[in-house]
Amino acid sequence: MILVNIDTYGFDCQSEGMPQIHFLDVTNRDGVQTARTGLSKFGKTMVNFYLGRLGVAQSEIGFPFLFHEVPYVRAQIALAEAGAFGDLRLSGWCRGVPQDVEKAVQVRAGGKGLAHYNLSISTSDYMLANKFRGKLDRDAVIREMTAAVRAAKAGGARTVGVNAEDGSRTDDGFLTEFALAAKEAGADRVRYCDTIGGDTPDRIRERFAKLASAVGMPVETHCHNDLGLAVANSIHGALGDLQAGQDAWINTCVNGIGERSGNADLLSTILAFRHAFDPQVNGSEIGDPIDLSWARRFALWASYAFGQPLPYNQVGVGRNAFAHESGIHADGALKDHGNYELYDDETLGPFPDDWHARRGRVVLTGEYGGKAGFRHVMDGLGVEPADEELSFKLVQLCNAQTSRPLTDDELRLIAEYPRELALLFSGAIE
């Protein structure tokens, strides 16, 4: 499709090879940092499974330099190689210092390590003064960051993104200097972090367009929701990238979870690029093969796994997202749901009907289950485990780790990829 739109910023969208939108989900890094909640390593594995099914480009899977993440990272590498996550790219997050990176690149499975990294360091004068407290100045920030980029590339990384933490409070001059130094060291993108969520759509678009033009590489959005603007800011930041002729990379989290008030919600952001009335937005080309038929299952699974109930008005997947009661609205929706609905709820996929949620007499499998119950459940799901004995042990271990009944999708993944998942429990399975 060829689109023609000259917007108020002077961006000519007429191109068959126009820049594209990509989604880099950070649920397994920023999302799991959410206070008062948590996610097991098996749960983080399921996030990658769902992101792969949804068609997202990349998952920031966690912290490969941390000792307790190492078995998990190895399992993700093995699962990706086995095809469990489709075309999903896996990336690791490190602080923007070479010591973290040197540890991370040593984590391997089957001789392969992570191919993608994001390296983060604070750039604002506020954080230099009040976080580092004189330990680092601007020159030191650039020195540490460039050394980290070179270490990642020397360790085999295909792509490296450099994160300007508190980028929204960093002046244009230093942001440009930081990004150009990163590019010279081998970085492929710079992540502009609206760390405390104070940016606004017009401001962030202007800054992205200016920065992406100045450095000649994509500026990645990382927007927090402290003012309720994370999705809007992510969209406008991406438009600034496109205006500068660069691909846009948008950070998201499932259900908008994340530090404090959360991050840009994955589903809301995708739906905006598909259904917003502004042709600059719905006319932007998404470069990822998004399959929204997995959206509802992912969102509801995440609510269950994180133990965070979805608000009734959660975009697309809340209980009231397609509910009508008042007279005028109900009448209009009964005649044609398009009168009061922007998109069809069926496009978001079916509601899960998990084995463990059945009522009445039911036989389950889990931490203390036996072979008969395990076989009964697998037969009921129509699943033939690749390795029955190993899958049986993994069901017990995963149930013990999550402290909740396993879902049908979790049981299917265990049955299909038991050898790779066993790496999560290094030393626990003989």
How does the language model describe each region?
Residues 26-29, 62-66, 93-97, 120-124, ...:
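Active-site beta-loop-alpha junctions enriched in small/polar residues
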Residues 21-23, 33-56, 73-84, 98-217, ...:
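Alpha/beta enzyme core
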Residues 1-98, 365, 369, 375, ...:
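N-terminal capping/small domains of soluble enzymes
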Residues 37-44, 69, 97, 138-145, ...:
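Generic structural signal for well-ordered, non-membrane alpha-helical segments
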Residues 45, 68-70, 170-171, 200, ...:
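Short secondary-structure boundary/hinge segments and terminal tails
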Residues 196-339:
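Catalytic alpha/beta core domains of metabolic enzymes, predominantly
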Residues 37, 62, 94, 168, ...:
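Hydrophobic alpha-helical scaffolding
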Residues 2-21, 25-27, 271-273, 277-430:
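A mid-to-C-terminal "edge-of-domain" accessory segment
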